[in-house]
Structures are given as C-alpha cells and as structure tokens.
Amino acid sequence: MTLSIQSLASIAIELQSGLTQRDRFQRLINSLRSLLRCDASALLRFEGQQFRPLAIDGLAQDVLGRRFALDAHPRLEAIARAGGVVRFPADSELPDPYDGLIPGHDQLKVHACIGLPLFAEQDLIGALTFDSLDPMQFDRFSDEELRLISALAAGALNNALLVEALERQALSPLASPGGSSPRENDEIIGLSSVMQQLKQEISIVAGSELNVLITGETGVGKELVVRAIHQGSARAANPLVYLNCAALPESVAESELFGHVKGAFTGAIQHRAGKFEMADNGTLFLDEIGELSLSLQAKLLRVIQYGDLQRVGDDRVKRVNVRILAATNRDLKQAAVDGAFRLDLYHRLSVFPLAVPPLRERVSDIALLAGYFCERCRIKLGLMQLTLSVQALSALEQYSWPGNIRELEHSIYRAAILARAEQSSSELQLLPAHFTIKAGALPARIIDDALPESAIGVSLATLTQHFQRSVIEKTLVECEMNWAATARKLELDSGNLHRLAKRLNMK
C-alpha cells in the first residue's frame, strides 16, 4: 500500500482545519495533489447534470468559473456514471475537460487522468479529478487506496452540503426547503468579498416578504439577483413576472400594470389581465422602475400599500398578493429629493436595498466570469476547446468594463468568433489581439473607434456628426437600446438626446 496511515491522517486533519468550507476544500485539494504528485487536482460538486468546481490546484484560475455539463464532457460523464475509481488511459479518445487549462502547458494534452465519484448514500454529489502529464504517474496507487481518499472527500462534501442547507433554511425560514430548480444560466458567479456579501444578503432577504430595491449599473446582473431572491422564497413555485418600465409608452403603461376591460379604450377588444394579476401569489419584477411617470407611481403605491387594484375602465376592485422586486440604475433617493420620484414609494420599495457592484470593483471575479462565458461559448460554437491565454486574461483584468458583465460576455463571444475565423480549428486559444478592448480609460477607445480611418478632406462638421452618431450607437447597445438610460449615461437631457438623434437621422 503506497499511501501510509500518516498520509491518510493528514488528509483527515486538513478536512477539519480552515476557517471556511472553501478553505478546507482548498487545503484538501492541495494536500491530495502533493500526495499523488500530480500536475492538477480538482474537487467538483454535482448539481443539475453538471459539475461545478469548488476547489482547484494546478489549473488555470478561470476553471473555477466553468460549468462542465455531462453531455458536453464524456470523461466527466463516465465518472458520473461509474460506481468507483475511473482510470483513463493515456491514449484515451475521450477529450479531457482540462486540456489547455494547465498553466505553462497550454498546447500540451493531459496524459493521465483518474476520476473518483463522490456519493452520499446512493446519490452522486461530486467528484475528485487528478491529472498528470506523466502517463504512468497513477499506476502505483491501488483502487483501494483511491477509494479511501474518495470516502474521506465524500464525507466532507456531504457535511458541507448539509450545513449549507441548514444555514440557508435558518436565514430564510419562510422559504420552501427544496426551493425551485434554478434555470440554466441563473447562477451568480463570483467569489470576491463584495459578491460573498451580496449572496449573504440575498439569502437573508429571500425568505422574507419584504419588497426589495436592487440598484446597480447597466449590465451588472440585477436580473440574476431578482431570480435568486424569487427562487429562495416561499413564492418560488408561483410566477415571477417581468416588466420593463422604461419600455412602456405612457399610453399603455397603466394597462400593462393593472389590466383593462373590454371597451376601456380604442383597441381594447377584450378583457386583459395586467402584470399584477399575472403575478398574484408570486413575484413582480419591475425593471427600470425609475422611468415610471409620477401619476403611475401614485397608482403603484396604492397597490403596494393595500393590495387593491382596478383594471382600466373597471370600477370593481381586485385584491392581489404580490411581492415587488424593483431594479434601477438611477439614484432614486436623489430623484425623490429632486421631485422626479415619489419619496413615499421610494421608502416602500427600499425596505431592504441591495446594491450590485460593478465589475471594476470585483476584478478577482473576472477570471471566473471569463471561464464561465468561455465554456458556454465553446458549447454554442461546437468547439472542442476554448481557453484564454495568460496575456488575454491580464488584459481583461486591466480593462474598466463600463458595460460590466454583459460587455465581458459579448467580448468573449466576439473574440471566439474572430479566433475561429483566424485559426480554423476546433481548439482555440483567445489572445489579446482577438479583443477590441484596451486597458485604461474608455474615452480613448471610443474616440479611436468613432472616427473614420481617414479624416483628410472631411469637414469638421461632418466629423463631429460622425463622432456623435457613433458614440450614441455604442452607448445604446451598452444600454440595451434603452434611450432613457443612454441619455443618463451620456449626461444629456432625454429630450435633447431624441432631438439630436433625429438630426443625425438615427430616428
């Protein structure tokens, strides 16, 4: 037996040390990599037909953000279906999910791999994977020894999952124990301290019945926060209804919110329920709530206060039971002071405010997010491998990301498409040249991109119009074609922006 009692005892000790579960898992992985003398090790959690890395050693940092779906990774599927130790021969035809993800060996294939499924009774809860560039590295370890390691890790992971479930129930006692199954791509990615704090606050407020105001810049992921709150609440089995207030023309906004009866106005050919009725006993997400008119804010306040609403054209009162989650990228408190937003409505909504940090304040999460989007992009484009070079990741971490996570996602996809056209291969590595971003301030990039390649013989007036049109177009895309948000970002009056757009033949 190659593994000594002392070695196994040291593993058990590592599982009891550390201040947090994350720290314990990292210590475990570090110890196992040293013990087995391999090049890479990983502890994965199994949920929703995919593996999620909890701790890694010897792998690129962006692996922590990747989600390995079974149907896209045959090696991991083989581990999930196995009842014990899985050894992959060095010449295995099954692609290794970590190919190209061992730093310093970007172009070198992983040679030897073993996988240990982790079970709690009969349920698969995770896996351990070990990889080595030496094809013979794992031959000296018996299956019995590896099963002992598996048993220790499975017990630790199962205990962690039980503690997590108990903590979640303690923080949200009104939430249903099982909760609802998250939709694909609903996960909030991030291990930075600000994101850990945000996740903690979400867990606290989710099981309550409080209305929540979620603030943050465009593209930070406010809708993901909304979904996390809804899924962690007692209303999770009931509807989550979405309404973008900024996209509502004033003439139809009241009908969209409260519904209407047949004949209430021209075109009302039948009765129609509004968003409040659709969300009865569930949750209503009011995105960009700061764009509602003051008159509609007054009617919204009444429904929030008393649960009473009237369809347009109807004298009858309906009662609804709806939880409000509102989001905005505006400073509503200042808007209330300025008279642009009702102060009483602001206080009703902001009982438990949540602020989602911009990406520039969580730089340590960029690698995880980049890995997450690389894996999704790899699957969508049908690639065998999609990795980031060290230089590319460094460039991503130095950029200010004014469009936040949404801009990062679009940049990854655009870079992958450029790389595929250039390399004509199913195994791609993204380089700095594949990204159109530049480290530092945004204005320089905008100026470079907005002006034509040659300005010789072009009048200053024409150049000015070209520049204005380009900047407005780029900002519109960043703001998801939201003119009101675009005006705020460009620090323009909304009416002036619309007039300028018409003058530039953009409307």
Swiss-Prot record:
Keyword field contains Phosphoprotein: yes
Annotated keywords: ATP-binding, DNA-binding, Nucleotide-binding, Phosphoprotein, Transcription, Transcription regulation
Source domain of life: Bacteria
Record's protein name: Anaerobic nitric oxide reductase transcription regulator NorR
Organism: Serratia proteamaculans (strain 568)
MF terms (GO), sorted A to Z: ATP binding; ATP hydrolysis activity; DNA binding; DNA-binding transcription factor activity
InterPro entries the record matches: AAA+_ATPase, GAF, GAF-like_dom_sf, Homeodomain-like_sf, NorR, P-loop_NTPase, Sigma_54_int, Sigma_54_int_dom_ATP-bd_1
Ranges annotated as DNA-binding: 483-502
Every Sigma-54 factor interaction domain range: 188-417
Residues modified as 4-aspartylphosphate: 57
